[in-house]
Amino acid sequence: DDLKSPLDEEERSRIQVEENYTLIILDIPTIEERKGKEYFYTIPFGIIFTDKYIFTVCLVDSPVLTVFMDGRVKDFYTFKRTRFIYQMLYRNATMFLQYLKIIDKKSDEVEKKLHISQRNQELIEMLDLEKSLVYFTTSLRGNEVVLEKLMRNTSIPRYEDDEELLEDVIIENKQAIEMAKIYSDILSGTMDAFASVISNNLNIAMKFLSVITIVLTVPTIVTSALGMNVRGIPFANNPYGFWIVVGISLLMTLAAGAIIAKNKHFK
């Protein structure tokens, strides 16, 4: 069952000490590409520590381990098992920081597009990025609890150098939490600002249409009143009656427009 736990996407971060092994489950960041777009979210990553071996369990090929397999980690030795665990945790914390910087760059790109188009597509992209930041913040806080428990845990042997590395992991994780919070606040503020701009633009458009409707109503009323087929209509027998009616309509329309402009209805 413990081997299957990290395979559950909803599994929470925790540390579990048993008689023959210690289970550590943390959330790691990952990217999924759907319909040509990248989505950021987190998945569980399990580490099982026994007397002789270390097992890792994850739903996908984790980039946490890629750097170790490629030989890009300094002072990495398989026989230093405790240090190996802390190095994986450190790698995970730095991955969060890297992905947060990517999210920040993407939000800047989307913001530039919003300055030009203000389409629903850009707003949806901003919402997806904000959702990713919420996932990251929640996962990082869960990881923080596990790291603090790991600092007090004695089931995994630890040496002086290992303690320093674990402290570095905790510092990196706290930094990632702060960055996620800052980026989330900035993104929320940006979305609120653009929502206000869009709402203001809509109000201006509605006001403009209302003014146009009022102005165009004036000639309609004049021509309807003077165009009725009844006796006593002014200018009915005048050979220039049509042009007189047109002139009256035009003058009244200009007067209505001047009154509206004077009252600053466009502002």
Q: Language model features by range: what are they?
A:
Residues 174-267:
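Hydrophobic alpha-helical transmembrane segments and their immediately adjacent juxtamembrane loops
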Residues 1-152, 156-159, 165-168, 172-179, ...:
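Peripheral, non-transmembrane regulatory/ligand-interaction domains of membrane transport proteins
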